[in-house]
């Protein structure tokens, strides 16, 4: 049996129980056979890199702590020499000339990048259906979405097409697909992980985070990728040691269930799972109660106003003069040239750019944007007050079960509401983890734990306690 977690992989390869080549070959074989469409680009040199790692181990040479672990990277994170398309025709064929800081840190610890995973175009979406390369599929049910926008990263880990992956989380884009695919997803405190080399969507909100099979694996990944970076002025210092204290427990900690995220509009099966998870945390020694965040009801509107405004600014560079799709000049008329270039954007990116231009236009005096910023500030204050009373805040990650591909494509507002429980952590910069807790009607349900800024270790410790008491099957039905 091959290892099924990153920590187990490192232990097995380190002890000679398996080899990097054996595991990597298995991951490549599964990628070719399973039909999850998790990748946009595969690393054709992965097996050669695995053999080199095995050779170094055999010779007794010093090898980084990843020991050749095959790790996938979302296609909006730059890897030198690989295509970085952001799942958009606008960047078709673009190869990054440099590595993102998170990739540099993984490679320094001798990880192998298996490839670039599928996503919603420019990370704008919740299902991967807005990818220019077609949707990815959920390993639990291939007719269902794996979530988004990091759906390919979650599907790849869920299908053991890699042992762990990186995604970006702007409003839940790591936690949402992790929940839908029965994996662990972690959004760190804003600034704890460098965004250098991440193609920008909404700079003040987004964060790179891991998608893994266990909480221990997420802690391992955080030990590798976190910390200050001179290339990203928003980063903060980090002590690390996330894995060392992972089993510290939750005894005596106060956990508050956010009532607005577990009440009206939630799927009854998810509501029942949430009550059960709360009881499980109490069984682990936590003191549980309920807490209200009144501003949550405005959070999705504020989130989409702010992110659309930042996206419109960030994507303005794709005007076909310095950045964007390389097309022949058919006219010397400047505005016509830009207009034709922008047709390469897909429908969701276009929708959000139009929204961003509208809410930030001088004709409206920026009043929509400023109101959204006010909501963000009030929500942050409420969250701080709640976390002064409670150590951690609990909610289901997503209020509904994974749904079929195509089911919500005609309902953009309904799709936006899938982010209802996750955007608060992004708007307030707080760490949050999604933990697979149970299975309802053959589909996984994840629980979200949110903590104080820089309380990432505490969130992971609580997530580990919940994982140990989860009702997930030992092996998913497709394995």
UniProtKB/Swiss-Prot annotation:
Coiled coil: none annotated. The active site is at residues 74, 149, 173. It is an enzyme of class 6 (ligase). Its EC number is 6.3.5.7. GO terms for biological process: translation. GO terms for molecular function: ATP binding; glutaminyl-tRNA synthase (glutamine-hydrolyzing) activity. Disulfide bonds: none annotated. One of its GO terms (cellular component) is glutamyl-tRNA(Gln) amidotransferase complex. InterPro entries: Amidase, Amidase_CS, Amidase_dom, AS_sf, GatA. It catalyses: L-glutamyl-tRNA(Gln) + L-glutamine + ATP + H2O = L-glutaminyl-tRNA(Gln) + L-glutamate + ADP + phosphate + H(+). Gene3D superfamilies: Amidase signature (AS) domain. PANTHER family: GLUTAMYL-TRNA(GLN) AMIDOTRANSFERASE SUBUNIT A, MITOCHONDRIAL (PTHR11895:SF7), TRANSAMIDASE (PTHR11895). Allows the formation of correctly charged Gln-tRNA(Gln) through the transamidation of misacylated Glu-tRNA(Gln) in organisms which lack glutaminyl-tRNA synthetase. The reaction takes place in the presence of glutamine and ATP through an activated gamma-phospho-Glu-tRNA(Gln). This is Glutamyl-tRNA(Gln) amidotransferase subunit A. It comes from Cenarchaeum symbiosum (strain A). The lineage of its organism: Archaea, Nitrososphaerota, Candidatus Cenarchaeales, Candidatus Cenarchaeaceae, Candidatus Cenarchaeum. The gene is gatA.
């Amino acid at each position: 049996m091959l290892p099924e977690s990153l920590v187990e992989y490192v232990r097995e390869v380190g002890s000679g129980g398996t080899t990097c080549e054996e595991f990597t070959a298995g991951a490549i074989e599964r990628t070719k056979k399973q039909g999850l469409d998790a990748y946009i680009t595969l690393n054709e040199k992965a097996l050669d890199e695995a053999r080199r790692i095995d050779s170094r181990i055999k010779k007794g040479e010093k090898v980084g702590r990843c020991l050749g672990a095959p790790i996938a990277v979302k296609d909006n994170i730059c890897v030198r020499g690989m295509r970085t398309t952001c799942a958009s025709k606008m960047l078709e064929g673009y190869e990054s000339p440099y590595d993102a800081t998170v990739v540099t840190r993984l490679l320094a610890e001798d990880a192998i990048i298996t490839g670039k995973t599928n996503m919603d175009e420019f990370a704008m979406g919740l299902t991967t259906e807005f990818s220019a390369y077609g949707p990815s599929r959920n390993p639990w049910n291939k007719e269902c979405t794996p979530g988004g926008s990091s759906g390919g990263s979650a599907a790849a880990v869920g299908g053991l097409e890699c042992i762990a992956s990186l995604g970006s989380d702007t409003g839940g884009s790591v936690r949402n697909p992790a929940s839908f695919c029965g994996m662990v997803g972690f959004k760190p405190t804003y600034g704890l992980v460098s965004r250098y080399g991440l193609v920008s969507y909404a700079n003040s909100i987004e964060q790179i985070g891991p998608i893994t099979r266990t909480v221990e694996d997420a802690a391992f990944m955080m030990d590798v990728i976190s910390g200050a970076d001179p290339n990203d002025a928003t980063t903060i210092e980090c002590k690390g040691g996330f894995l060392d204290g992972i089993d510290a427990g939750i005894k005596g900690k106060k956990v508050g269930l956010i009532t607005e995220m577990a009440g009206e509009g939630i799927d009854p099966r998810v509501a029942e799972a949430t009550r059960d998870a709360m009881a499980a945390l109490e069984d682990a020694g936590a003191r549980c109660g309920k807490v209200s965040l009144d501003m949550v009801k405005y959070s999705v509107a504020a989130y989409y106003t702010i992110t659309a405004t930042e996206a419109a600014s960030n994507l303005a560079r794709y005007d076909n003069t310095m950045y964007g799709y390389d097309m022949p000049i058919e006219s010397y008329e400047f505005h016509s040239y830009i207009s034709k270039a922008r047709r390469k954007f897909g429908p969701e990116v276009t929708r959000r750019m139009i929204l961003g231009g509208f809410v930030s236009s001088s004709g409206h005096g920026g009043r929509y944007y400023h109101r959204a910023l006010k909501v963000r500030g009030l929500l942050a204050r409420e969250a701080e007050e709640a976390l002064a009373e409670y150590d951690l805040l609990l909610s289901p990650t997503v209020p509904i079960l994974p749904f079929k591909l195509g089911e919500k494509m005609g309902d953009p507002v309904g799709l936006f509401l899938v982010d209802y429980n996750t955007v608060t952590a992004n708007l307030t910069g707080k760490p949050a983890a999604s933990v697979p807790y149970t299975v309802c009607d053959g589909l996984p349900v994840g629980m979200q734990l949110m903590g104080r800024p820089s309380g990432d270790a505490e969130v992971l410790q609580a997530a580990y306690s919940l994982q140990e008491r989860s009702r997930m099957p030992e092996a998913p039905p497709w394995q």
